[in-house]
């Protein structure tokens, strides 16, 4: 099909492929004919190896059906892979319509996982249309060992993320992962072709290693502001630190190395699947931002903890709002 059906993301949606045996129609309701992530396919499968009088119950546990399913799945994926190489524009149109469903196979199908991952396409900060992971690696900066990505509810929301600022400033490409299924397959696949996946909203990054610490005159003031923020915000944040991610924005939130990624936690919370209380985040401040500089100058004065109490909460609220969360 060339267009996305209305019920494509309905979990109850069934494949529309018809099964024939020796050119005799058997059923158009055979769930075991194709995996769920190929539910957008249309077509006909004709087998010479099944009996004409086979029942629906027998189809469900028939080893011949398993062989047919594997063969048809392999054939479809191979044809799509050929299309990706020969007709880039046509494949990208296909991916825009059905890619979010096909990526379910990365999570569900161990046998074809690597193949589907190579077929996957994503937007990136390069803003040159869809790109594959192999193409991303070919463009990586010298010495870069990480596949950087950011997740979000939409492409527009991901592009607004302040955590991207430092990566853009250093010309480090970041992939946009904006389908909910991306969060789940990322939990199972830590790397691709020897390059690890790293969220720009979680933990440390190569930016921290490459950015030389500025010996600025207000460094003691920044340290004082960090101490004030930690005191005023308490357990509402896991830590407060200066940021190498930010070049313009005053603040941002990131997940600690061992904590769940921010967007993944939001998805689980929306579906009431989050066990326990949401993790406190790390608040990062931009030492070069004019507002932060002004607050840092106030932080060294007597009584600054009380004087900056409301401002501390405002900074945290601002960081939450930029993440799309209500403070």
What are these model-predicted stretches?
Residues 1-327:
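Conserved GHKL (Bergerat-fold) ATPase module
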């Amino acid at each position: 099909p060339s267009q996305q059906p209305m019920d494509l993301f309905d979990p109850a949606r069934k494949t529309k492929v018809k099964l024939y045996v020796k050119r005799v129609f058997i059923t158009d309701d055979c769930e075991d004919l194709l995996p769920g992530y190929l539910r957008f396919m249309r077509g006909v499968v004709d087998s010479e190896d099944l009996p004409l009088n086979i029942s629906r119950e027998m189809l469900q546990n028939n080893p011949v059906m398993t062989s047919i399913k594997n063969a048809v799945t392999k054939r479809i994926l191979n044809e799509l892979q050929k299309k990706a190489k020969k007709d880039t524009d046509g494949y990208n149109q296909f991916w825009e319509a059905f890619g979010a469903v096909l990526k379910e196979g990365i999570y569900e199908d161990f046998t074809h996982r690597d193949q589907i991952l190579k077929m996957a396409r994503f937007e990136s900060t390069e803003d040159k249309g869809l790109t594959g992971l192999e193409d991303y690696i070919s463009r990586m900066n010298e010495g870069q060992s990480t596949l950087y990505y950011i997740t979000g509810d939409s492409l527009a929301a991901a592009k607004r993320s302040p955590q991207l600022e430092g990566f853009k400033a250093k010309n480090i490409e970041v992939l946009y992962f904006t389908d909910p299924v991306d969060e789940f397959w990322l939990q199972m696949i830590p790397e691709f072709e020897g390059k690890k996946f790293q969220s720009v909203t979680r933990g440390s990054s190569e930016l921290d290693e490459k950015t030389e610490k500025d010996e600025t005159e207000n460094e003691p003031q920044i340290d004082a502001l960090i101490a004030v923020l930690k005191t005023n915000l308490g357990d509402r944040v896991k830590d407060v630190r200066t940021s190498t991610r930010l070049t313009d924005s005053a603040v941002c939130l990131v997940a600690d190395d061992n904590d769940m990624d921010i967007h993944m936690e939001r998805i689980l919370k929306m579906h009431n699947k989050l066990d326990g209380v949401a993790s406190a985040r790390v608040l990062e401040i931009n030492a070069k931002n004019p507002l932060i500089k002004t607050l840092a100058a106030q932080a060294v004065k007597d009584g600054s903890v009380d004087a900056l109490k409301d401002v501390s909460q405002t900074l945290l609220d601002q960081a939450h709002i930029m993440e799309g969360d209500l403070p």
